[in-house]
Amino acid sequence: MASPRWTSSSCRRFHSDFIYGLLILRHDRRRILWAGATAHPTAEWIARQLTEVCGWGQAPQYLIRDRDRIYGATVTRRLWALRIRDRPISPRSPWQKAYVERLVGSVRRECVDHVVVLGERHLRHVLLSYMKYYNETRTHLSLNKDAPMPRAVQAAGRILCLPILGGLHHQYGRI
């Protein structure tokens, strides 16, 4: 029997499932309104997410979106029912929704690239944790180094460090 050598090879089949994320961003303060995840995105799922984020009376005036086929008649009808004006961008023009493109890059660089996602539920948890960090703690130069949800200046005291996403990010506060 031959001993293993560098010329020996081994193979193992594997598959990778994709999990899709949905981020909805409010432009005025760059606040993430919604973060969702699914393994099987459909027009019905997108419509349900829009209803969850907008409710029936809290809807924004416009939805700026790309021209993906998933935004079909079902989503268009839901936007009409929520009284949201649909504003698809021009074909192959991602710069027309630059704030969201920047957000997706931040989520990838600051979060998902450093976490092994174990499934749809886990990705949803990771995105919601990052959304809380992004909205309440992470500073933005365009907001004069404030967070999307403004916070009061804290009184003098001992500084406490709270880990976020298992220590990937930290929030500092005074007690």
Question: PLM ranges: what are they?
Answer:
Residues 1-175:
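Charged DNA-binding/catalytic regions of mobile-element recombinases
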